[in-house]
Amino acid sequence: MSEYKIVYKGGTGEIVEKKSRFIANVFKVESEDEALEIIEQTRKKYWDARHNCFAYIIGENGQTKRCSDDKEPQGTAGKPILEVIEGAGIINILVVVTRYFGGTLLGTGGLVRAYSGAAKEGIANSSI
């Protein structure tokens, strides 16, 4: 059996990039249904946000991996969040990053950095 990390207690992290707020919430999940339910709850909690992008990895061997850009340009939100999770070597994890648009377009590079940065911050503030 290979070594892996799991979330003991989820956390949050927030960064601000050109007046846009990126709020990451990290959750421990055991199934895809649980992840989808939490994503829906997060959308309701942050109903006034522009985007709720997410990524999750579920299963001992990371069998289930999903991500969503939630109407951000393709590959600028969900994939960077997923890459942060993979880089940290964590399974049974869901990271949802909520964006409140600040009025300034960040460009694709800026979005990737912001979503990655928020995800890293959220994971750093979680107990793994």
Predicted feature residues:
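Short C-terminal domain-edge/linker segments immediately following a structured domain
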Residues: 55-59, 83-88, 125-128
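C-terminal regulatory domains involved in ligand/effector binding and gene-expression control
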Residues: 1-75
